[in-house]
């Protein structure tokens, strides 16, 4: 999402913020019933509790991508997530389907850390250093333009759910991979596959240079210097506090956390894995969870028979995810009901052509 898109978005009328929760719930329910199968609302795990009850599907990035690709009925897809997710949905659905983001300010700081101009500047430098031995792999948390570049160069997208499988495949295709934009997911996945940390380099997009002290021939993974602003805030100190004060607690974290945190946790995995593992755990078990606050709160509500806390007691929700709220959802649905188009997410054909190659490779491998 660029600045122009943000400036050009429609502004929600103030009266929506003045409505009561009950009034908004009643209106959203009414419109959903009226539109029926013509409306589909996918919702990411990190969304607010006030939005989640209206979701037709709830999931992580991989689940929502798969669901979007399978849905051919709904004319209107109102995506309760962030910008790159809505872009992915637009590319995976038909040209007749319209994807809408209730608030265009719902971006992703990690996705914004990898700009297409930075990538096109980086690639020739890496080719000079390593020749044609690199396969680009991009986390699904990236812009459509980044996905398109990766697809055009034979690479694939990846999610936290399928990272081990996808990265393993990528390393069979070429001698080394260029993983972007999240260095932590890339590092944790590569390490899990047996690649030592000393064989991983950092690409600094600000300086447009490789940060690596070893022998270039030993470098197997090049990590873009990006990160999740939420998961970066889980620390080794948080884990030490849990071990000291709650020795029976099992610690599970998202692989977007730093390598130090993931290494000290009992387990790590995607939001789907975290939810499934805790839901299936025995009553009375204790958990400290290292992921986004809205999801942790929902896991606590759904598991009253277990003791569950956030690994970081001062953790905030993902603030860009939090921009999707009930007033914006209602505003969007009323526009659809009135035959108006608001905040449509549309990826151009050329970008879609190659981005789809990257997405389809991932979906086939998954």
UniProtKB/Swiss-Prot annotation:
One of its GO terms (biological process) is 'de novo' NAD biosynthetic process from L-aspartate. One of its GO terms (cellular component) is cytosol. InterPro entries: NadA, NadA_sf, Quinolinate_synth_A_type3. It is an enzyme of class 2 (transferase). Binds 1 [4Fe-4S] cluster per subunit. It catalyses: iminosuccinate + dihydroxyacetone phosphate = quinolinate + phosphate + 2 H2O + H(+). One of its GO terms (molecular function) is quinolinate synthetase A activity. Its cofactor is [4Fe-4S] cluster. Iminosuccinate binds at residues 44, 61, 139-141, 160, 254-256, 271. Keywords: 4Fe-4S, Cytoplasm, Iron, Iron-sulfur, Metal-binding, Pyridine nucleotide biosynthesis, Transferase. [4Fe-4S] cluster binds at residues 108, 228, 318. Its EC number is 2.5.1.72. It is found in: Cytoplasm. Catalyzes the condensation of iminoaspartate with dihydroxyacetone phosphate to form quinolinate. Belongs to the quinolinate synthase family. Type 3 subfamily. PANTHER family: QUINOLINATE SYNTHASE, CHLOROPLASTIC, QUINOLINATE SYNTHETASE A. This is Quinolinate synthase. It comes from Listeria monocytogenes serotype 4a (strain HCC23). The gene is nadA.
């Amino acid at each position: 999402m660029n600045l122009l898109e943000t400036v050009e978005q429609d502004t929600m009328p103030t009266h929506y913020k003045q409505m009561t929760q009950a009034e908004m719930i009643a209106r959203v329910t009414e419109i959903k019933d009226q539109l029926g199968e013509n409306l589909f609302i996918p919702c990411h795990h990190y969304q607010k509790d006030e939005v989640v009850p209206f979701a037709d599907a709830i999931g992580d990035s991989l689940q929502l991508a798969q669901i979007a690709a399978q849905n051919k009925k709904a004319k209107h897809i109102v995506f309760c997530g962030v910008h790159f997710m809505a872009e992915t949905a637009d590319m995976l659905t038909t040209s007749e389907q319209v994807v809408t983001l209730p608030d265009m300010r719902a971006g992703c700081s990690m996705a914004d850390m990898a700009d297409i101009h930075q990538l096109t500047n980086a690639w020739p430098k890496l080719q000079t250093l390593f020749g044609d031995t690199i396969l680009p792999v991009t986390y699904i948390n990236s812009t459509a333009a980044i996905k398109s570049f990766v697809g055009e160069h034979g690479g694939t997208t990846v999610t936290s759910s399928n990272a081990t499988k996808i990265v393993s495949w990528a390393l069979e295709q070429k001698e080394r991979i260029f993983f972007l934009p999240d260095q932590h997911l890339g590092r944790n996945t590569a390490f899990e596959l047996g690649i030592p940390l000393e064989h991983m380099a950092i690409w600094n997009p600000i300086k447009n240079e490789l940060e690596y002290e070893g022998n270039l021939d030993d470098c197997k993974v090049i990590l873009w210097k990006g990160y999740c602003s939420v998961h970066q805030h889980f620390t080794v100190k948080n884990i030490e506090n849990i071990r000291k004060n709650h020795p029976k607690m099992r610690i599970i974290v998202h692989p977007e956390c730093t390598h130090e945190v993931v290494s000290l946790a009992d387990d790590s995995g995607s939001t789907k894995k975290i939810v499934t593992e805790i839901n299936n755990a025995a009553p009375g078990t204790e958990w400290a969870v290292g992921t986004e606050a809205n999801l942790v709160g929902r896991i606590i509500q759904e598991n009253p028979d277990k003791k569950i806390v956030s690994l970081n007691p001062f953790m905030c929700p993902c603030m860009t995810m939090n921009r999707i709220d009930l007033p914006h959802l209602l505003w969007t649905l009323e526009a659809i009901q009135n035959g108006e188009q608001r905040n449509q997410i549309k990826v151009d054909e050329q970008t879609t052509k190659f981005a789809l190659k990257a997405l389809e490779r991932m979906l086939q491998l998954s």
